[in-house]
Regions:
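Short hydrophobic/aromatic-rich motifs at helix boundaries and adjacent loops
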Residues: 6-7, 145
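Bacterial N-terminal signal peptides
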Residues: 8-21
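Positively charged n-region of N-terminal signal peptides that target proteins for export
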Residues: 1-5
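N-terminus-centered regions that define maturation/targeting leaders and the start
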Residues: 24-193
Length: 193
């Protein structure tokens, strides 16, 4: 071998050995939001779409919230907030489909449909539709996919610290200095016609 290649291979081996010696974060330590029904970037079912045809003719579903679960929240977490946002809806502002918070730290998820109605497990905020519970997608016909960003936020606030009815922006302001970490999941939906 030429000396240049030998030196290069030795340097490469040293670099690999150095990288392998660095402790890596275990996946088990990462704060994760998931759904047993939908993979990240997966599609929401028709039943997850909004159902109030009087409010929007684009509603084609049953307004059943998908099941969600989270694991490995940061140390010191006292409560969670959970948001659902569609950045493509009503462009350029986007649509806030759900704002809930005050979720106790011992809650690790919600069953299918559980976020579609008031619960002792969360404080209802105010979505764009003025509701404190889940409102599913209502995309117009003949439009491209919309992306629905689910965000779980770990906070150091007591579950009863915030008043009901906060909008997404009001919640963001109230959480300043109290966020321990967050995790997200993206789902997609488009009108079936």
């Amino acid at each position: 071998m030429k000396p240049g290649i030998t030196v290069l291979l030795m340097a490469g081996g040293f670099a690999i050995a150095s990288v392998l010696a660095v402790p890596l974060a275990r996946a088990a330590d990462v704060f994760i939001l998931s759904s047993p029904a939908i993979q990240d970037n997966g599609t929401l079912a028709i039943k997850n779409a909004c159902s109030d045809k009087q409010r929007s003719p684009n509603c084609v579903g049953e307004n059943v919230s998908p099941p969600l679960a989270w694991s490995n929240p940061p140390d010191g977490t006292k409560s969670f907030a959970l948001l659902l946002f569609d950045p493509e809806g009503r462009a350029p502002a986007g649509v806030s489909h759900m704002v809930v918070y005050g979720i106790p730290a011992d809650v690790k998820g919600f069953a299918e449909g559980e976020l579609s109605k008031p619960s002792d497990k969360f404080v209802g905020g105010k979505s764009l539709m003025g509701l404190g519970v889940y409102t599913g997608p209502g995309t117009p016909p003949n439009t491209d996919w919309h992306h629905y960003t689910w965000t779980i936020i770990a906070t150091d606030l007591d579950p009863k610290a915030l008043q009901p009815g906060l909008t997404r922006d009001e919640l963001a302001k109230a959480l300043e200095g109290h966020v321990k970490g967050s995790a997200g999941l993206v789902t997609r939906f488009r009108h079936p016609t």
